[in-house]
Amino acid sequence: MDVTIVIPTKNAGRLFEKVLKKVFAQETTYEYEVICVDSGSSDNTIEIIKKFPCKLYEIPASEFGHGKTRNYGASKGTGEYIVFITQDAMPASSKWLQNFIDAMKSDPEIVGGFGIHYPYPDCNVIDKMDLYYHFKNFGDDNTIFQITDENRQRYKEEEGYRHLLSFFSDNNSCIRRDIFEKYPYKDVSFAEDQIWAKQMIELGYKKLYSRFAPVY
């Protein structure tokens, strides 16, 4: 298996069916599986999941954790790459997965990456602009971030630069399984993705920003 896509869910709502349709409509040469980990939905989320060839795992709401639930979902798959999206992150391209994995495979030192987020069409103007400028900071192409001798001092001294190099988002991310099994997410209440990326950057690994693997 090339890719395991993990989606934590709880009361995902009507949009989730559209998300799964886009996930399963990917035009890709990579073999992929989709794992949903539901933590106590009381709406029709389970019924929606069962319409698709997903692997479903249900856990009590009390057992949910942003880090540990994603770790659990990843452990149930076999893909060489683990892709995390949220229940409202809809692939904005039929080449989303192909572009993401191609970019990850372009450099053997890349251990994780995140893709651009587009605003939904009905998003308010302020949020649209906020998203635009946030991701504009990462570049207009696929961009690789790494601490080197040239930027190490800047990383230590500038908070904004540290954030740039360590930013990561599980709304739309991809991690090599061999690395994730060695360095899983921390069991924390939030920011498990940012903590992980900071650790990887400071260990000397490379992080990818993919301009061509978009989700809404």
Residue ranges with predicted function:
Residues 38-46, 89-90:
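A conserved acidic beta->alpha catalytic loop
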Residues 60-77, 87, 95, 99:
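Glycine-rich, basic loop-to-helix element that forms the pyrophosphate-binding segment
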Residues 82:
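Short aromatic/hydrophobic "clamp" motif used to bind/position activated sugar donors
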Residues 90, 94-140:
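Conserved donor NDP-sugar-binding/catalytic core segment of glycosyltransferases
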Residues 145-175:
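A recurrent flexible, glycine/aromatic-enriched loop bordering the glycosyltransferase active site
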Residues 190-196:
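Acidic donor-binding loop at a coil-to-helix junction in glycosyltransferase catalytic cores
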Residues 208-214:
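Catalytic beta-strand/loop signature of glycosyltransferases that borders the donor
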